[in-house]
Amino acid sequence: MIAHKQKKAKKKRVWASGQPSAAITTSEMGLKSVSSSSSFDPEYIKELVNDVRKFSHMLLYLKEAILSDCFKEVIHIRLDELLRVLKSILSKHQNLSSVDLQSAAEVLTAKVKAVNFTEVNEENKNDIFREVFSSIETLAFTFGNILTNFLMGDVGSDSILRLPISRESKSFENISVDSVDLPHEKGNFSPIELDNLLLKNTDSIELALSYAKTWSKYTKNIVSWVEKKLNLELESTRNIVKLAEATRSSIGIQEFMPLQSLFTNALLSDIHSSHLLQQTIAALQANKFVQPLLGRKNEMEKQRKEIKDLWKQQQNKLLETETALKKAKLLCMQRQDEYEKAKSSMFRAEEEQLSSSVGLAKNLNKQLEKRRRLEEEALQKVEEANEHYKVCVTNVEERRNDLENTKREILTQLRTLVFQCDLTLKAVTVNLFHMQQLQAASLANSLQSLCDSAKLYDPGQEYSEFVKATSSSELEEKVDGNVNKQMTNSPQTSGYEPADSLEDVARLPDSCHKLEEDRCSNSADMTGPSFVRSWKFGMFSDSESTGGSSESRSLDSESISPGDFHRKLPRTPSSGTMSSADDLDEREPPSPSEAGPNSLGAFKKTLMSKAALTHKFRKLRSPTKCRDCDGIVMFPGVECEECLLVCHRKCLENLVIICGHQKLQGKMHIFGAEFIQVAKKEPDGIPFVLKICASEIENRALCLQGIYRVCGNKIKTEKLCQALENGMHLVDISEFSSHDICDVLKLYLRQLPEPFILFRLYKEFIDLAKEIQHVNEEQEAKKDSPEDKKHPHVSIEVNRILLKSKDLLRQLPASHFNSLHYLIAHLRRVVDHAEENKMNSKNLGVIFGPTLIRPRPTTAPVTISSLAEYSNQARLVEFLITYSQKIFDGSLQPQAVVISNTGAVAPQVDQGYLPKPLLSPDERDTDHSMKPLFFSSKEDIRSSDCESKSFELTTSFEESERRQNALGKCDAPLLDNKVHLLFDQEHESASQKMEDVCKSPKLLLLKSNRAANSVQRHTPRTKMRPVSLPVDRLLLLASSPTERSSRDVGNVDSDKFGKNPAFEGLHRKDNSNTTRSKVNGFDQQNVQKSWDTQYVRNNFTAKTTMIVPSAYPEKGLTVNTGNNRDHPGSKAHAEPARAAGDVSERRSSDSCPATAVRAPRTLQPQHWTTFYKPPNPTFSVRGTEEKTALPSIAVPPVLVHAPQIHVTKSDPDSEATLACPVQTSGQPKESSEEPALPEGTPTCQRPRLKRMQQFEDLEDEIPQFV
């Protein structure tokens, strides 16, 4: 429509004048060109509108800068941007060029340059910039008129022709410089001339500093662009190398293909050029471009700031001298006024004296003298003020001269700095483009050579070679005999037969030319031998023949075999649920063409991750839950045919779960779940999260700086945690960053309800950390001491702490110990690369200390003492990492598996509350060969053959009792019923073994180390000891064994079978006679004092002594029973792990006939019976100090028959009766079935009476019967 109006107006002007003028002719010519080229081009109109809109925005920005900030630099920048936009518009649209428009731009530039910004304030702002605003409006009006005339077709070339040549070549960017700043033509200036030009400007320093700052920003942008470009090119080269390697391996196995050598050379050229480009990128990132330019930029910034500070100091000094000059000037004026007043007063006094009488002459003379004196003083002050003013003027002049000199020096320094920076920028720019040119030149030459080689190829040449090779009789015999497989001759309706696999395709012998696999489909009716029939099928799949996308193909997978193309009936659609295990088992096995990851079917155009390529997907028909995002998958979802994994199509790009080729397990809650739930599913008890993360970090991040300290991406960390819960072992974590993997590992350890080091061992490990701190302080104090070299006390302390830590760690369950061992070993490998990753054992201790050892969570407020324990936690982990090779022996502890008689696996209870399983004699020799230095042991235990065999027979019984006592702590009644039922079954089978042990002629010999020369004090007793039992226990002897066994199961203490060396001992008066007996591989008496407090608050159970005699007494039976509650006098020491034969002896004694027993010979128990009763929770420790003696009860004599058992007697001062399975009532053993009372306080233990000790020694020598 606009073009129609233009033509109509043009015709009216032409015919109205009668003859067309030159201007009209020119207008017509311009209009024709515009109409033909631009008016009918909508893209041109759109571009013109955008340019005009940009110009209007630049005008508004300039006006807003003037109104808001009034900063000179900002306004000049906006003006330069406006002129630059105007220049670009005129260069694009030549018809808009005009003298009026350029004149308006020059006027605007001149007005802006003429403004003195130092005089601008809020009051006179509008007056000063009035002319500038009018110039802006003039420029906008002129541009609008020219644009309107252009659109209406009234623009002629006369306005362009009137432009002088010098004006046409002038740039709008140089208008301000040419019209205002430069008095002469533009040209090259010497450095001195540049400095002189800047010295004439009052703001020369500010301009130079502003240019330096702009140069720094400009350089920063250039460096950022180059770095980003190089990173993209580096990533691209890596992908190109992978693609070239994969393609090369694919086409290398194919034979008789056209231009194969040419494409192989092209791939090699790509690989070579990619390697060269990587070297070029590394050089540019190092010393060829980035580093020199960044160094020069930093130097520029540093010197610019120093120069700016120096210039401000000089300006402040000049300002101070000018202020002092103004004050001196005001003082001079004030002194001058005072002098004038004094002088006029003196003049009036003289006149009064002349006109006065003689009588008043004396008084007037005095006044005259006084005023004359004041006048002289005022004159003197005037002279002093003048002198001070002159000095100030001199100082101002000196400061101004100094400022000028400083200004000249600063300008020279800035000019030199800018030239140096430009020189560096020039050098690195030359390096950049020269290296890129060399890279492009080599690539161009290789491409040219490949182009020339491709022109020489004769079409069909390779096919002819292929036919010649297949027609040879010798080749046919070799193929039929060695390579090709028999093919069926059954007819196919489609004309194709399915090939087996890539291995089924025939290979030609090496004597022929290099054979390549055929990529084109041959004719279906080709006839010939079996070798030819193997090639007659389709050589590529449907997706390849139709130009399908190969984006979803893995770069590492092999190419599709020639027999992959065949037809097949569609499979039955999926039911869409995760429970379709029957469908998974019943469906037909996949064909060779569909077995590979490339057979994606309808999903070949979907972007997939490396893990997604391992699956074999099909369409999902019903809604279910996505394994990647945990969202509901509607109909646009996919399901794996093998593992039944379901996810959205859009989630295939980020899927990290690999196909396990079997049904995928359900989601397992790992983070925040109980440790035993995850550990029991692993054979070694180490959670798979710990193993996966640690192995991945060791593979690629041991040298990464800040490993475990730098945080990862929160979103990616949460996604990895979700993937581990969904896929467990099948998660591919190679796509995640190392810091994300570290965050996942730390998060798992932090969210454990109970850390690896259990809550019950927290205090012992904290005490150990304090000892470590004490040893470190001593080591620092004695480091420079010469006596320390002669007496290495520190090394002994370190060894003592090492052995103590080993003993403490043995108290951990097997899964906790193995997991801690694995983690500490991994952290040790991280510390080995501390020079690269900057993470030593101290840093790792600070990070992992609060996660590996922490107190039981409470609601108490955080105090300073609790905060101080963080350092102890970090110090302990640092110690474990530093001495990991000495603390951990390198072998993992085996997992304990509980199996019932029926063959079913028993429910696994919390291993944290169970003692360690007993070790075999071989294991005791290897694991406990070293004695802790803080023990006072003197001898080692030598176990006899009888002990080892009896240990093997009674292991299952000990294990059952240990499990039962540990489960006795549980409060849930249902669990108690189930567990007791299971252990009753185990006890029945175990009792039979115990009878065999009792009947065994071999003895269980325990050696005493009471004497220092390792000689036994007494010979082994050949007769049975008398029996001391309560009444109710004696009545049970006549009952059936099953009734007794059901009751005896509850009386077994788990601690006597434990491997825990931390036991509480009695404080004896006579330390010289203390016995140190060792049973089952560890010392009973060697207990450190810091460990004694662990079991002080526990409750204890009163036990009785049972001694089976070897003869049948004929006397009556008398039994004394008493109630003995826990008090210091009867406080039992912890009984160590006893031999397995002890239990068997007690069980066998119960099953034998009754015999005569006598009254107890030690302290009487408080309880009415020997069975354990839980203490009243309301009683206090102080109340337990009372002791009540009960009368004895006479019982009819009962005979107890038992086989003779020879027992080696230990010292009576030992902590337990080792030869028989019972202990005296004065030594009740602590019970592990009841938890420790928190309100109970540790009490002192009453020392044993010396008289009672002597009496027991006498009984050892001479048996006494009642």
UniProtKB/Swiss-Prot annotation:
Superkingdom of origin organism: Eukaryota
Low complexity biased stretches: 542-561
Alphabetically ordered keywords of this record: Coiled coil, GTPase activation, Metal-binding, Phosphoprotein, Zinc, Zinc-finger
GO molecular function, one term: PDZ domain binding
Site (Arginine finger): 709
Cleaved signal peptide residues: none
Domain F-BAR: residue ranges: 192-462
Composition bias, Acidic residues: 1256-1266
Residues the record lists as Phosphoserine modifications: 171, 176, 179, 190, 501, 521, 554, 920, 956, 1028, 1149, 1151
Residues in Phorbol-ester/DAG-type zinc fingers: 614-659
Known partners and oligomeric status: Interacts with PTPN13/PTPL1. Interacts with RAP2A via its coiled coil domain. Interacts with RASIP1.
PANTHER family: RHO GTPASE-ACTIVATING PROTEIN 29, SPERMATHECAL PHYSIOLOGY VARIANT
Record protein name field: Rho GTPase-activating protein 29
Protein's organism: Mus musculus
